Amino acid sequence: MRQYLDLLEHVITTGTDRGDRTGTGTRSVFGYQMRFDLSQGFPVLTTKKLHLRSIIHELLWFLRGDTNVAYLKDNGVSIWDEWADENGELGPVYGYQWRSWPTPDGRHIDQIAALVEGLKTNPNSRRHIVSAWNPALVDEMALPPCHCLFQFYVADGKLSCQLYQRSADIFLGVPFNIASYALLTMMVAQVTGLEAGDFVHTLGDAHIYRNHFEQAQLQLTRTPKPLPKMEINPAVKDIFSFRFEDFELVGYEADSHIKAPVAV
């Protein structure tokens, strides 16, 4: 995952120091892109160990259309706890927008179902897009979507995905986002009869929080290891039927975890 270390180094050396919503302060750049060929291994960091369980369960939670942290907590995932209210609710966040986008006439659009159907029936379309950024509901969300829009593209029997991320917490969030959307691309490829191609990650405000500088410098001293392979149960043909047990990361070797505080 040299691409990720290059991003860290680029922001540390060329970024601008700025204030931010959390009051922590950041160093950031505006506009950055990484590309990962999914045939070359699963793009998960090897220079610090990631909690893959959290990544998989969060993605399955999104695909359920869920907006309550109960499912996550039941599965030992706490990454959304800081933003949930006393009942575990987060408002109309990712899952709601993906699966139940509200229209002015009272209907709801299942963007994921429409995406899969479109890829099967009209793969050359340039409209294979899912948006989580709903201006009418942003103020009702506990945390407006950081990874807010993604598009799929089919060529030569391969499915590629490009994500636009408006706000990118490089040290804590981006490694999760890379693995999550790479996995989503593989899942969608499987259920549409395609091979996984590239995951393209486009960042808007790409930032490192001030209280992550030391951890980022430590990570830059580490050498990337070979990428592992993600094996997915080939029997699953419906995007909404995947379960945690359908995924196995084979050959994952990583350096020790590096702790860092979350800016809320």
Swiss-Prot record:
Homology family: Belongs to the thymidylate synthase family. Bacterial-type ThyA subfamily.
InterPro entries per record: Thymidate_synth/dCMP_Mease, Thymidate_synth/dCMP_Mease_dom, Thymidate_synth/dCMP_Mease_sf, Thymidylate_synthase, Thymidylate_synthase_AS
GO biological processes: dTMP biosynthetic process; dTTP biosynthetic process; methylation
Protein name: Thymidylate synthase
GO MF, any single term: thymidylate synthase activity
PROSITE patterns for this protein: THYMIDYLATE_SYNTHASE
UniProt keyword Cytoplasm, yes or no: yes
EC number in record: 2.1.1.45
Residues annotated as binding dUMP: R21, R126, R127, R166, S167, A168, D169, N177, H207, I208, Y209
Pfam families attached to this UniProt entry: Thymidylat_synt
Major site of localization recorded for this protein: cytoplasm
Function per UniProt: Catalyzes the reductive methylation of 2'-deoxyuridine-5'-monophosphate (dUMP) to 2'-deoxythymidine-5'-monophosphate (dTMP) while utilizing 5,10-methylenetetrahydrofolate (mTHF) as the methyl donor and reductant in the reaction, yielding dihydrofolate (DHF) as a by-product. This enzymatic reaction provides an intracellular de novo source of dTMP, an essential precursor for DNA biosynthesis.
Pathway: Pyrimidine metabolism; dTTP biosynthesis
Lineage: Bacteria, Pseudomonadati, Pseudomonadota, Alphaproteobacteria, Hyphomicrobiales
Subunit description: Homodimer.
Catalytic activity, as annotated: dUMP + (6R)-5,10-methylene-5,6,7,8-tetrahydrofolate = 7,8-dihydrofolate + dTMP
Cellular compartments per GO CC: cytosol
Location in the cell: Cytoplasm
Keywords, alphabetical: Cytoplasm, Methyltransferase, Nucleotide biosynthesis, Transferase
